[in-house]
Amino acid sequence: MAAETQTLNFGPEWLRALSSGGSITSPPLSPALPKYKLADYRYGREEMLALFLKDNKIPSDLLDKEFLPILQEEPLPPLALVPFTEEEQRNFSMSVNSAAVLRLTGRGGGGTVVGAPRGRSSSRGRGRGRGECGFYQRSFDEVEGVFGRGGGREMHRSQSWEERGDRRFEKPGRKDVGRPNFEEGGPTSVGRKHEFIRSESENWRIFREEQNGEDEDGGWRLAGSRRDGERWRPHSPDGPRSAGWREHMERRRRFEFDFRDRDDERGYRRVRSGSGSIDDDRDSLPEWCLEDAEEEMGTFDSSGAFLSLKKVQKEPIPEEQEMDFRPVDEGEECSDSEGSHNEEAKEPDKTNKKEGEKTDRVGVEASEETPQTSSSSARPGTPSDHQSQEASQFERKDEPKTEQTEKAEEETRMENSLPAKVPSRGDEMVADVQQPLSQIPSDTASPLLILPPPVPNPSPTLRPVETPVVGAPGMGSVSTEPDDEEGLKHLEQQAEKMVAYLQDSALDDERLASKLQEHRAKGVSIPLMHEAMQKWYYKDPQGEIQGPFNNQEMAEWFQAGYFTMSLLVKRACDESFQPLGDIMKMWGRVPFSPGPAPPPHMGELDQERLTRQQELTALYQMQHLQYQQFLIQQQYAQVLAQQQKAALSSQQQQQLALLLQQFQTLKMRISDQNIIPSVTRSVSVPDTGSIWELQPTASQPTVWEGGSVWDLPLDTTTPGPALEQLQQLEKAKAAKLEQERREAEMRAKREEEERKRQEELRRQQEEILRRQQEEERKRREEEELARRKQEEALRRQREQEIALRRQREEEERQQQEEALRRLEERRREEEERRKQEELLRKQEEEAAKWAREEEEAQRRLEENRLRMEEEAARLRHEEEERKRKELEVQRQKELMRQRQQQQEALRRLQQQQQQQQLAQMKLPSSSTWGQQSNTTACQSQATLSLAEIQKLEEERERQLREEQRRQQRELMKALQQQQQQQQQKLSGWGNVSKPSGTTKSLLEIQQEEARQMQKQQQQQQQHQQPNRARNNTHSNLHTSIGNSVWGSINTGPPNQWASDLVSSIWSNADTKNSNMGFWDDAVKEVGPRNSTNKNKNNASLSKSVGVSNRQNKKVEEEEKLLKLFQGVNKAQDGFTQWCEQMLHALNTANNLDVPTFVSFLKEVESPYEVHDYIRAYLGDTSEAKEFAKQFLERRAKQKANQQRQQQQLPQQQQQQPPQQPPQQPQQQDSVWGMNHSTLHSVFQTNQSNNQQSNFEAVQSGKKKKKQKMVRADPSLLGFSVNASSERLNMGEIETLDDY
């Protein structure tokens, strides 16, 4: 069959056989894959499924009564979403073969698959190809099913036809447990969705290309079909009963020949392939099964043969030389396994198998090393005696062979050419063998292909040809052409083998006869129902024999579709394997089903003996024809030699013509009969036109030993007159012939000498050739040495380059390390510096902590002292209580005088306030700057009679006077000592420059305060209502003190002001730092420390104020203190502090008195006027605008807070007990923000320095404020506050008196 025709029929054989159905053994036609007409509008499966809505309501038309019996409430889901039932699964899992067998045995259906449940017909599907003709099987990723044979493959409706299509004929493997099915995820459908337009039967080639084009590790390996390689695995759960496919990976690379030209003879010998491609078996195997899967790369020629890229054949194979292999019938296979062989035939098999396994991996070279190795690799089953005879005859039987032929030559005086002729014939045969040998794959000689040992070896060269080459598809032929020298040696060895074979034939005949008798005796002795008839063997596609299996197992596998019609099977009693289709044809039924068993098959041994005899006869005929042709050539040469001596007569001319005619006839017969056997054919198979069919003819003489040219035997077809002429000519020249014989003998001797000379010359030539070979070998060694030297030089050069590169890398690394080291050093230095700073900070913290501890200790001592003083004060208070009655009359008089003084002071204070308002650029009437919160105090007081008020005040003033006398001297002394101690402690660091001038005594300060208090009382009494609440009288006194002394603009609760003022001004024993500046923020210092002694100090201090009330009555000093404390209160407001800080930063030209400007701005109500004043004094800058914006925001917040406090004031007064005002909590410490020693130092400084005093700003945190001086009127304050000489008239308050 031509190559072009073959490529057209490259599809699977079983599919063509099923489609045609022409042969007897093919099953009936199964439904072919129909070609549906494509619809005009096609929708994908997902598109159709997307149209299905589970929630669709039933149409109203169907709700009629007539439809109710057939109406279903819930819509049926699409079949793609419904899992298969068991029956459907079984139907879709059946293969073509099984369905065909069921129909053959009468158990199957007609033309469709058994069962179409739920009314589904073959037309129901998702478009093309979804009918009952689909026979499914699972991929690698589907789970071993529930059926006993592993046939429970989950076929899901969610799989499309394309996803299932090319896996229809696949069968599950032996151990595929625990793989996820399609719906559980996994790469099942990777690379599987091919939208085929044609049916699957036409698409095998396109699909193969698409498969191979995909990801090598992905789709086709994971979801590809497993096809034949797994179909032949035995299904026993614990592994194969004989050598399984997993054990021999080499077999996977054998080429599966497509049996061309032999379809009529071997229709069932083809191996069924899943998609028709010759490499399906290899592709269907997992990668881990193949040793060098990644190395086996190649291509396909036009005939579909796989060509490896490792050694591509150097020349194309002629079409007439392509091999058509047929496995030798395994007639003796079971006899080996049953022990009919002797022990000597078994042991070499094992050793040969091991040797063959080793040599098979080595490849082509291993098969060419020795004849022993190649023979054992090619035919491991050959008996060892035969091999040893061949191996020994290679060496020692060459010379006896030559001597025998020389004897035959001497008889005919033709000895000189025959020895050269016989080896030349062998060389021709070997040359013919070499061409097909190069086409045989290297794995053809795998020792795992067990062949029948007793088959006689016609020629060791032909052994590989007989092996059944049914390996895994996809493993192409590997060229085994040896090198030139090895090829010459190989030719010589093969010629020697052929010569040695002729002598071994007799021994083989005897052995064959004895074995034939044994087998026939054995076959006769087997009973008809013997167990051997129930045991079956089969040969899998890898060439292995699997079994034995009983009828039930074989029947199950056959029904499941594992066996093709070309499967070689036999019973244990049969002598050879037969195709399953032939057995079914002969038996008329499936051989595995129960029924009468035919007698054992014994025909192969007779065929083998006949073949053997035909081979021997053909060899003898070939030798005889060669010899006869040689003799005719010699006679013709003699006649030509005689023609030179004398002119030929007519008889001689006729004789010469007859000789020429005979020579031409013999040559024609030799050329007609194909002398050279076609080594590409199997020896056991008859082939038309081959030498093995040559029959001996009666017309050819078997022996000719004529002594001369004229003794040449003539054909019976020679005419009679020519024979008579020859006889007469012989009689006439008998004497002449005797002389010619002597001459011939002399000539033979000369020829013998010539032959010896030629032999010597040949030996010399061989010696020369050997020397040349030796020189060539030396030259090669020198070249190899030079190449090695060159490689060594290159290696040294590379090493030098590597060393230089490493050196450069080392230098770069050192530079990087140096840079890193420098960075590390800098980092360490930075760390050291940070550590030193941290150490200094810790030292500073330690010093501050030590100072705090000192202050705490001092405070505790002071508390103890105050406790003792309070005890003494209590005793004195008791003493004074006794004297109180004596002073009662005197106090009443003093009270009248104080009322007059208060009225006078109130009048002067009102005048002064009017002047201040005019001096401050006519501030708005809503401002509270410098005003007393009289209205608040008045509103908060209940109405009491004037007599009750006076009585309460007289009693309280008397108590204050008595207490003041006792504490005056002690307080004075303790205060001076404390100031001296703290000044000494803080002299080292953190102190501020001490104010100069003499200090006023505490008594003077207390007297001034008492006068202020009396004056304020008189003012309050004039403005109060006649009736006041009794519980608010006591607090009113303290409120008036705070307002008159401090000039507070804050309208907090009066009781609260009393407790805060008295404790913060006069409780000097709780001082912290007497040198602290006037504006220092000490909010946190005023907290819980003074809460312990506040209540104790209030009573005694109130008495001292009452005592000093009578002693000093100067109104000027009261006004000075009033003015002073008004400034202090303003400065200590948090909002005022922020304004001063911002203005100090913005006042770069030093042309602004900050406290005055702040107090002025706070009284300006209109935001526009605020912006105008700030722009006029600070300039039109972005900082000034930002300050104005924040100033307005903060002022609004402060006013909101003040209003909220005023609203809460009545509630707090109702909740407070009436007679305990000193114990109320502090709420205005944040506004005052001053510690006790600060106020005391301010009193001392301002009273002692009448001309000049600096209000010093002390650092808050670590930042010092700029010292600012308050410009005041000396007529009001009693002392001068002139600015420094560098600042002329800065900070001076202008009043109406200046104009």
UniProtKB/Swiss-Prot annotation:
Residues 1013-1025, 1090-1104, 1202-1217 have a biased composition (Low complexity). The modification Omega-N-methylarginine is found at R107, R118, R120, R149. Changing R589G: Probable risk factor for PARK11. There is a cross-link at K1123 (Glycyl lysine isopeptide (Lys-Gly) (interchain with G-Cter in SUMO2)). Residues 289-298 have a biased composition (Acidic residues). One of its GO terms (cellular component) is membrane. A motif (4EHP-binding motif) lies at residues 40-50. Residues 860-919 are annotated as: Required for interaction with SARS-CoV-2 non-structural protein 2 (nsp2). Changing N457T: Probable risk factor for PARK11. Residues 151-182, 225-247, 312-329, 338-363, 393-414, 957-972 have a biased composition (Basic and acidic residues). Component of the 4EHP-GYF2 complex, at least composed of EIF4E2, GIGYF2 and ZNF598. Interacts (via the 4EHP-binding motif) with EIF4E2; the interaction is direct. Interacts with ZFP36/TTP (via P-P-P-P-G repeats); the interaction is direct. Interacts with GRB10. Interacts (via DDX6 motif) with DDX6 (via RecA-like domain 2). This is GRB10-interacting GYF protein 2.
